[in-house]
Amino acid sequence: MTMDDLDLRLLDGFQRDLPLEPRPFAAMATRLGTGEAEVIARLVRLRDEGIVSRIGATCRPNTAGASTLAALRVPAPRVDEIAALVGAEPGVNHSYLREGDWNLWFVATAPDTAALAESLVRIEAATGLAVLSLPLVRAFNIDLGFPLIGPRRAMALDRPADLDALRPRDKALMQALSSGLALVPRPFVALGQALHRSEAEVISRIRALAEARILTRVGVIVKHRALGWTQNAMVVWRLPEAAVEAAGTALAGVPGVTLCYQRRCVPGLWDWPLFCMIHARSHAEAMEVLAEARALPELQEVPHRILFSTRCFRQRGATIAEVAA
């Protein structure tokens, strides 16, 4: 994989804030000092080379659909078998093998909570293993991005979504954005045709959903491992409910912490409510970020566990609507 300066500036500058106008790639080209056709050609190449996943959006969990982070305790000889069974469930969009007793972690998504519960029941039936389900309680930072130029950066703190902005037809639009825009000069025309909506309406709704923080990011969604971010550590922290908000707010501001949120505990099975993700280019870099986090006054002496990913089985956009139309 070889990327030049323009590739790096394209990927670094547009992982969020895609220009929401009829010719977004032309607007990107103007900022980059090149042409629209060149931007589109590069995005096609970067997608085909496995560096870019899509040009689209990431959606806030549990707004237009339902989701949970879940885990299984899988005996080592059955890892490949169980991972295949979990991956066969349509709503599973992320699946990783991690260090620890609960070792196969996955994100399950569905159009609603009832469908999500049914999905987890099917996984339990197929695998013969109990599912640990840890739904999101609150997000401190879910604006995942990967700086390619300059030092590590602190991610912006999350703000609550305005769910009143959601409209009945937005689910299909969000599902389409999770799959990605067509790499053509006027992608919102193509998207609108698929959804039987006008270009202007599509752009207006994307802008409204982004401003409402229902869409947490609109831009170039990269495949971080292909860009050298090979270390993926999930760090969990055990602390009382009353301390979670202050600790989570501080933790989310540490450069190198790429996601931070609180999840529901399960008595007797899981008592680690605060989660953060550290994506790094090396194990040593990840541990440096963790050291900075542990030095925070809110987290000093707080018990924690660091669970590195050892294999990635699946990573794709979320399932929001049963039919994107």
From Swiss-Prot:
It is an enzyme of class 4 (lyase). Pathway: Porphyrin-containing compound metabolism. One of its GO terms (molecular function) is lyase activity. It holds the Pfam family NirdL-like_HTH. It comes from the Bacteria. Keywords: Lyase. It catalyses: siroheme + 2 H(+) = 12,18-didecarboxysiroheme + 2 CO2. Its EC number is 4.1.1.111. SUPFAM superfamilies: Winged helix' DNA-binding domain. Involved in heme d1 biosynthesis. Catalyzes the decarboxylation of siroheme into didecarboxysiroheme. Belongs to the Ahb/Nir family. Forms a complex composed of NirDL, NirG and NirH. All proteins are required for the total conversion of siroheme to didecarboxysiroheme. This is Siroheme decarboxylase NirDL subunit. The gene is nirDL.
